Amino acid sequence: MTKKICIAIDGPAAAGKSTVAKIVAKKLRFVYIDTGAMYRAVTYIAQKNNLAYEDETAIAQLLQKTVIRFEPGEVQQVFINDENVTEVIRSLEVTNHVSIVAAHPAIREALQERQQIFATEGGIVMDGRDIGTAVLPNAELKIFLLASVEERAERRFKENVAKGFAGDLNQLKKEIEERDHLDYTREHSPLKKAEDAIEVDTTSMSIEEVANKILSLAEQKINN
């Protein structure tokens, strides 16, 4: 029987966390938890309810009444209560404001509690900004993915084109730099590498190479 470890994958925006985490989870037959989608879902409910993204109290109160759940699929399906929000939480409006909502301590605390509940049984791969430091500090394997701003902007640009969005590469670079600044400097659970995390610079690596490296590390932990 496979040992059910917890794998934490952290890193900045567009470093390839979600794509790699999904591949790793599928290969190991673990559950994938997309914490970024949870923050996007909260940003979307703020937008839908005409709340200011800076209004921490109002958003936190709304979150208390909200169920966020995942269902498996070719693309993991995200639901807010019974509404499928898988596509809408990837909108440019949500993308450009999620770092503001994610910086609120009340939101981070509420979502971290939910994320820790998901992980109680083990056998999960969770990606985000603070998984190895705040959400799963005892995860058996912690990975910190890095890539240059240029590389990350190129990846995001290609993703947007594939989805039918027109994009401006220089604007994407600017947006990624702004998100990095917000993520690294926020007061509550900033983006940082856990002391025991293994750093992987993905700049010149394919998604498959990154996934295979993490799978090799995971198998060492599982077989230990």
Curated annotation (Swiss-Prot):
Q: Which GO terms describe its biological process?
A: nucleobase-containing small molecule interconversion; pyrimidine nucleotide metabolic process
Reactions mediated catalytically: CMP + ATP = CDP + ADP; dCMP + ATP = dCDP + ADP
List the EC numbers from the record: 2.7.4.25
Q: Could you confirm whether the keyword Cytoplasm appears in this record? A: yes
Compartments it resides in: Cytoplasm
Q: Name one Pfam family in it.
A: Cytidylate_kin
Recorded GO molecular functions are:
ATP binding; CMP kinase activity; dCMP kinase activity
Write down the CDD domains for this protein, in alphabetical order. CMPK
SUPFAM superfamilies linked: P-loop containing nucleoside triphosphate hydrolases
Enumerate the InterPro entries for this protein: Cytidylate_kin, Cytidylate_kinase_dom, P-loop_NTPase
Q: Which UniProt keywords apply?
A: ATP-binding, Cytoplasm, Kinase, Nucleotide-binding, Transferase
Which family would the database say this protein is a member of?
A: Belongs to the cytidylate kinase family. Type 1 subfamily.
Q: What is this protein called?
A: Cytidylate kinase
UniProt lists the gene as cmk
